[in-house]
Amino acid sequence: MNAIITRTYIILIPVLSILLSGCTEEKSIKAAVVSARKEASKIGVEIMKKGGSAFDAMIATDLALTVCYPNAGNISGGGFLVYRTADGKTGSLDYREKAPIAASRDMYLDKNGNILPDKSTLGGLAIGVPGTVAGLEAIHKKFGTLPWKDLVQPAINLALNGYVVTEKQELSFAEKKQDFIKINGENTFYAQNFRANDTVKNLALANTLKLIAKHGKAGFYEGAIANDLVERVQETGGIITHQDLLSYEPVWRDPINFQYKDLNIYSMAPPSSGGICLGQIMKMIEPFNVGDYKHNSMEAIQIIVEAERRSYADRSLYLGDPDFVKIPQNELLQEKYLSDHMKSFTFERASKSTDILPGTISWEESEETTHYSIIDPMGNAIAVTTTLNGSYGSKVFVEKGGYFLNNEMDDFSSKPGFPNMFGLIGGKANAISPQKRMLSAMTPTIIEKNNKLYMIVGTPGGSTIITSVLQTILNVYEYDMDIQTAVAAPRFHHQWLPDIITFEPNKFKRNLFDSLQKKGYDIKEEYNRIIGRVDAIKVSDKGIISTGADPRGDDEASLLY
């Protein structure tokens, strides 16, 4: 077994360094990385200290998360990048996973048309064709300044020298241990009893990264890594072949662009639903001046929830992979269409999701995702959200390679009208088809104000990604919160179906729930999972950089002065 564990019990006294958690605001800050792990954030900043750009730092940060954040960091999943260069040019990269060539619409249904339990979430059949390494190489070819091998080496070093398990990770490993054993056997790498403060060295992953450092994309999609991946997928019931790996290509796309008051917002286009849904919700609430109501007041919550309800209804019908289905993108963001959508809203009574159908248009995702935000000294900004979908993906572990494989196939509509693991309803537009990209809720977002960079924001959280990003933006813009306060503020969520407002536990007052219930809203609070873990960067009109790292996770910011 390629594992080395050391266990220490040392209390460390924090010292002042460039690695800081939470909100920092200093005129001297030149660059920042905010991610799910301090090791990854620090590696990203170290790359920029050596003269690398935000794009170089992105590659190094991403690969570091593969090592120290194995529940979502990955070389075997996919993601989305939204960027803004220092001269104001914007764009995005789609390196979302794809369905295998052998995939079929009804592959998760039995002979009676019923969904087969766990087939799209656990084991080899749940695995989509990975896009991460191809995406990273595409970014490097277009924007990279430092040599590729220099960007991979820090992750290799981290795998060899080890990362320290946090208390939250200890709980995560323990929670999934039986799934790891069920799929991979008792001797699988992450079935060991890793505990907080252990140092975990993943030698197999270090060797995998060495091949990627030497051969780039070809090192993953061809040769020994590809052979081990295909073998592991197929022996656990999957259908990915070498042809699937060789045919994978990422796609450069135009981001969704919309205005909210004096903000100019760029977010991810389909196959992510994030940009369109975020745009719809913000345009629907704009006429109500939500900032006139107290933060998280009943009225503010009503406005936001009713807009969310209507947008998620549209999501279920219209959104999918634009390479396979025609998406009425412009119509979905038209002000008249959105205004008509909200006409049935009243403060007096909750709308019912059963009465809210997707709007009529004439026209021919896991909570264990991870997000990071980066700004470099030149002013380049990137927002990246990447995922294995569920926590540790399919739970299939490639022992020879040291990494988990995704369960991204669950983000398709296995059966139109039925929910996925996050409770999201999908329609025919998101039905399974060979080499199709599955719909996502990932919402990496970059915002301008007065033609200047204003905010970089995103989060994991499955179906709650869109609403968590939304509330963070509103907290800063409408309620004048600093970025750390905005990131940490209590959140709530509605997604059309199920017709429930989900509140972060123990953060809202009982009398608020009573008032909402009297108006016909169903409330859920007890035993809910955390709603998002936002990582964000804000730039003031004077150019002062501040960071927000979500305290709900182990997230930290690393800064370059």
For the regions a protein language model found, what residue spans apply to each?
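C-terminal motif of bacterial Sec signal peptides marking the signal peptidase cleavage site
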Residues: 20-22
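Active-site rim segments in enzyme catalytic domains, especially the processed small/beta chain
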Residues: 67-92, 239-241, 381-449, 479, ...
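M16/insulysin-pitrilysin zinc metalloprotease superfamily fold
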Residues: 181, 275-291, 447-455, 461-487
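Internal maturation/activation junctions in enzymes
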Residues: 287-387, 397-401, 416-417, 425, ...
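Noncatalytic scaffold domains of N-terminal-nucleophile
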Residues: 25-42, 46, 54-216, 220-222, ...
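Extended C-terminal subregions enriched in glycine
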Residues: 436, 478-529
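Bacterial N-terminal signal peptides that target proteins for export
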Residues: 1-11
